[in-house]
Amino acid sequence: MLSSSHLPTTIVTPKNVPTLGVLVGGGPAPGINGVIGAVTIEAINNGYRVLGFLEGFQNLILQDDSKIVELTIDSVSRIHFEGGSILKTSRANPTKKQEDLQKVVKQLQKFNVSLLVTIGGDDTAFSSMSVAKAANNEIHVVTLPKTIDNDLPLPYGIPTFGYETAREFGANVVRNLMTDASTASRYFIVVAMGRQAGHLALGIGKSAGSHLTLIPEEFLPTTDSTEPEVTFSRICDMIEASIIKRLYTSKKDHGVIVLAEGLLEYMSTDELKQAFGSSLKYDAHDHIMLAELDFGRLVRDEMRERMNRRGLKIAFTEKNLGYELRCAPPNAFDREYTRDLGNGAVRYLLNGGNGALITVQGVKMVPLSFDDLKDPRTGKTRTRQVDVSSEGFQVAKRYMIRLEKKDFEKEETLKGLAATAKCSVEDFIKQFKYLVQ
């Protein structure tokens, strides 16, 4: 199979021929190579030269001609089976400086690129919008929605490519952890990627049947005037309550808890600084680098301390679930999906289209205008969050182990929970009743 090390090494020179460019921004996701292959084949079959720009916008900003490769049908015809990206990727942000945007446009024009396909998530979509405007629409740009987070503003029920593979891979990991938990009598605290939305954590937890899955959306306010109720103590109270209830109802001292890393995104800066101190780092788009924070370890240590105080002998192990999902070989769904997306992107551009996110809805390719994707408050790409009022989320909750109002209404149950927690009924109510109000 072709890898980035096997790409053509011939130095690319500008040619006065119709040219389409393709680049990848942001983190990897299963299916990137499938898109690159589909775009390349369709463009060449329509008379275009196809250039791949290595490492996203980074080398366009640097105007490094050595980081450009010419793609051929032969070089991409079988790459759709492989994870990763033959064009690599980066998080370089050309919107930080106006001069960087102009460098990108100048470099694209130097190589006669009139059509540009970018593959990425919310930040890449925003950068693509900016490039199209900086080029005065002389370069037509489309973005293909890539992220395992599944948080781009597509219509509900339509995934971003890579999500389905990541969900399947993650659910299989959690299934194995469940067997390990049962065998070794321990709890696993699994932290799944998802900076601003809990789609991946919920998809993994629901399809694997984890005992509790927590995502940021269920803590978000219903009005803009209310602060999110995401605190470290609340998260740990919910986990502790789930463990106590499972121990009371089924006498089981093991299980798997899935947490979305995005829970950290909605905690206050003061709380994050208190928990992580100088280890807080930011990326080129000013996002806290959540993957660099050991959220699972923090929760693990807190739960160990809580159980020890109660005199309960329960073991905990943390597991971060993220990087191993991003470059998994795409499953059949994502291989088919990316072929549709790549083909649709080229056809849209050839028909004069510009400034859109390409989607497949039902049996049709549907472009979504960049302008319609923007959050009017920030000017950046909107985030699609989990709809906690949806039947899908409510079904997921019903199969979790959580405290419910009825647990506090039945005296026998309440006494049993308190006895399991080795505390008085009054203390149990004081600590946990707010979770069901």
From Swiss-Prot:
Coiled coil: none
Location of the protein in the cell: Cytoplasm
Pfam families given in the database record: PFK
Residues that hold substrate according to the record: T147, I148, D149, M193, G194, R195, E261, Y323, E324, L325, R326
Gene3D superfamilies for the chain: 3.40.50.450, Phosphofructokinase domain
Chain positions recorded as diphosphate binding sites: G27
Organism: Naegleria fowleri (Brain eating amoeba)
Role description: Catalyzes the phosphorylation of D-fructose 6-phosphate, the first committing step of glycolysis. Uses inorganic phosphate (PPi) as phosphoryl donor instead of ATP like common ATP-dependent phosphofructokinases (ATP-PFKs), which renders the reaction reversible, and can thus function both in glycolysis and gluconeogenesis. Consistently, PPi-PFK can replace the enzymes of both the forward (ATP-PFK) and reverse (fructose-bisphosphatase (FBPase)) reactions.
Catalytic activity, EC: 2.7.1.90
Enzyme type, top EC level: transferase
Regulation: Activated by AMP. Probably promotes oligomerization of the enzyme.
pH dependence remark: Optimum pH is 6 for the forward reaction and 7.5 for the reverse reaction.
Gene Ontology biological process terms, A to Z: fructose 6-phosphate metabolic process; response to glucose
Active-site annotation: D149
Residues that hold Mg(2+) according to the record: D122
Annotated site, Important for catalytic activity, chain positions: K146
A GO MF term: metal ion binding
Full protein name: Pyrophosphate--fructose 6-phosphate 1-phosphotransferase
